[in-house]
Amino acid sequence: MEFEMNRFPVAKLITALGLTMLSAHAQTPSPSADPAANNPDAAKTQFPLAAPAGEDSGAISIAPPAAVNQGPLDPAKWKYGPAYDSQPDSGIWNPVMIKMMKGEKVTGGTVLSTDTPATYCAMANAGYDFIWTEMQHDPRDWDSVGRMWKACPHAKAVPGVRVAYTDEREIQHAMDLGALVIVVPTVRSVEEGKAARDWTMYPPLGKRSLGAGQAFEPEMWGNVPGGYRNTINKNVVLIEMIETVEGVKDAREIAAIPGVAAIFAASGDLGNFSGYKMGTPDYERLINIVHDAAIGAGKRLCGPFLWRDRPDFTCFQNATEVTAIQRGVADELGPLKDTQGKPEVGPYAPRK
């Protein structure tokens, strides 16, 4: 009975001790992943140049003593920093740019209607210098293009594309997916030409945003010498198409835009927009003006493969994957082409 009587005070004591320990534990702050929670000077040590909390730093007018750009902030006078300079030993790693710099002829095979990686890769390994993935006249989406390019990024032909229009979203989709040749259609003015250049090139030459994309992946260009961000401006081939009379008038200024590698005399649309057919004096005059603009600016001159022997033309658009298949079969079969049997009845019988 004595034990039973003393048991309750002991239990009360244990309960009281437990509550005291819990209270003490609750009042002791746990370690935090936030360094500022355990180090009151963390902001000063990690961000020594940061503005004081809750105060106007005056940075719009006064720069830190070690800053290159002193005085009031003026974008027009801003000296671009060296963070993204390409190293002298990084070299040119785009085979198309290498050939164009030498003045050699380059050809682009057109992928018009397929979104199948196997067909794209067959074209990319057929012998062209680049693939002209058609996005102006085909309704495929950019996801399809990305899958095709990623299926064989280091094929013989580098991935290229004709975008639909001079637009930040359109061109940056192409660049972020890994395009090494950008063809811009229907450039009507110097302003449009500069806009196309701006969305293709990173600063300081252009205005391309530094985003993510498969272009940065190791399977694509993530491991190129010097790094993708620092070297793509001197590797991407930008071709601007002259397709209208207005574009022809501004062709010299368009060709002279820094970053434009070539201008393209669009054989079909120059006829479409001028009303004259190839070979007529008015048509040929327009082509010759584009020719003069390219050689005057020291840029390459592009056109259809039909013009591969025309003076000073060195880069060309070839036919589509469908035409390439037809040509390949014709070359392979020779005299056996179109020698199918001719039944007199049934779906294969000649129509009467």
What are these regions (language model features)?
Residues 148, 191-205, 322-346:
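C-terminal helical cap(s) of enzyme catalytic domains, especially alpha/beta-barrels
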Residues 60-110, 222-234:
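N-terminal amphipathic alpha-helix/helix-capping segment at the start of soluble metabolic enzymes
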Residues 109, 134, 182, 196, ...:
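Conserved, mostly hydrophobic/aromatic
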Residues 181-257:
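Conserved anion-binding
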Residues 181-192, 263-273, 314-333:
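Glycine-rich phosphate-binding active-site loops on the catalytic face of alpha/beta enzymes
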Residues 142-168, 172, 200-205, 231-233, ...:
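Alpha-helix-loop-beta-strand connector modules within alpha/beta enzyme cores
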Residues 102-117, 160-164, 236-249:
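Active-site mouth loops of central-metabolism enzymes
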Residues 166-180, 184, 191-193, 248-257, ...:
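Catalytic cores of alpha/beta
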